[in-house]
A protein has these predicted regions:
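Bacterial N-terminal signal peptides that target proteins for export
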Residues: 1-14
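Flexible glycine/proline-enriched surface loops and loop-helix/loop-strand junctions
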Residues: 46-51, 97-98, 106-113, 144-154, ...
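Bacterial N-terminal signal peptides
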Residues: 13-21
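Mid-domain, small-residue-enriched loop/turn segments at the edges of structured enzyme/sensor domains
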Residues: 92-93, 97, 101, 117-173
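A short, well-structured edge-of-sheet supersecondary motif
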Residues: 26-48, 229-230, 242
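Active-site SXXK
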Residues: 53-80, 104, 165, 240
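Short, well-structured active-site flanking segments
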Residues: 70-86, 179-184
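Structured C-terminal helix/loop/strand segments within mature extracytoplasmic catalytic/sensor domains
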Residues: 49-53, 119-121, 173-275
Length: 275
């Protein structure tokens, strides 16, 4: 299965725990840190709960890019350029402009995702996600709201675990997803550079979202933060996942802080793995 990941016991977690804790703010906790070899799918480091599914939030854009390329909707990094219209999601200033695929990924533009999901439709989205092993592949949206194409991946029905995220990314970078090679290469090109550490060049996608309270409102003090992607050095590729959850409200998104924390931890992680 494309999204399959092979787990082996990781023996260094206790030794690294004290080192990694220093870079994580006291107001957030790591749910999972996961590193795996992209070619063999072997987990090299696993710490925390990496099996529970939560919303993918904007990390879903990577899978959506593969789907849209494969379906012929996305043609290149700059096609199609779609016009912004009043009424579209625009709570970030950079979203209020005509947007192409490169801008979509860089600025994490929700309304562009919504136009792509509408063009794909629920049936194709579900079929692709099932073939990718992408979480529960549930695009139904909020119960009774008929909004699956608009927000199923944002604190709604679509859920994925860190292990499943790693499996999807491993299949993507290893060229093993059941899509055209052009679709995989095009999607990878869109993913932004995440930083360089210890000679490793990281590329990944952040994601931020809030869990729901019992009354359906968002719990803005308990936001999730994702950073999901791959790292390259010489001829080797590793896939990584960092998932955090806040314990109080923050001005900076959880995804950006998860990215920065993983970058700060990367050198210690690589030393612990002997890489």
């Amino acid at each position: 299965m494309p999204g399959e990941i092979f787990v082996r016991p990781y023996m260094f977690a206790a030794a690294l725990a004290g080192v990694l804790a220093v870079s994580v703010p006291a107001q957030a906790r790591d749910i999972c840190t996961l590193i795996a070899d992209a070619a063999t799918r072997t987990v090299l480091h696993q710490e925390g709960d990496c099996e529970t599914r939560v919303t993918p939030a904007s990390t879903f854009k990577v899978a959506l890019a593969v789907m849209a390329y494969d379906a012929g909707i996305v043609i290149s990094a700059h096609e199609p350029k779609l016009p912004f219209k009043e009424g579209y999601a625009d709570w970030i200033a950079t979203w209020r402009q005509d947007t192409d695929p490169s801008m979509w990924m860089e600025n994490s533009v929700v309304w562009y995702s919504q136009r792509l999901t509408e063009m794909l439709g629920a049936e194709k989205l579900t079929a692709y996600a099932q073939k990718f092993g992408y979480g529960n592949a549930d695009f139904s949206g909020d119960p009774g709201k008929n909004n699956g194409l608009g927000r199923s991946w944002i604190s709604s029905s679509l859920k994925i675990s860190p292990l499943e995220q790693a499996g999807f990314v491993a299949a993507l970078v290893d060229g093993k997803l059941p899509t055209s090679p052009v679709a995989m290469a095009g999607a990878m090109e869109l993913v932004q550079q995440g930083g360089v550490s210890e000679g490793w060049a990281l590329r990944g996608k952040t994601g931020s979202a809030f869990p729901r309270l019992a009354d359906g409102n968002f719990d803005r003090a308990r936001g999730w933060g994702w950073f999901v992607g791959w790292a390259e050095k010489d001829e080797r590729r590793l896939v990584f996942v960092r998932l955090t959850q806040d314990e109080e409200r923050h001005a900076v998104s959880g995804g950006l802080r998860a990215r920065d924390a993983l970058l700060a931890d990367w050198a210690a992680l690589m030393r612990g793995l002997g890489l």
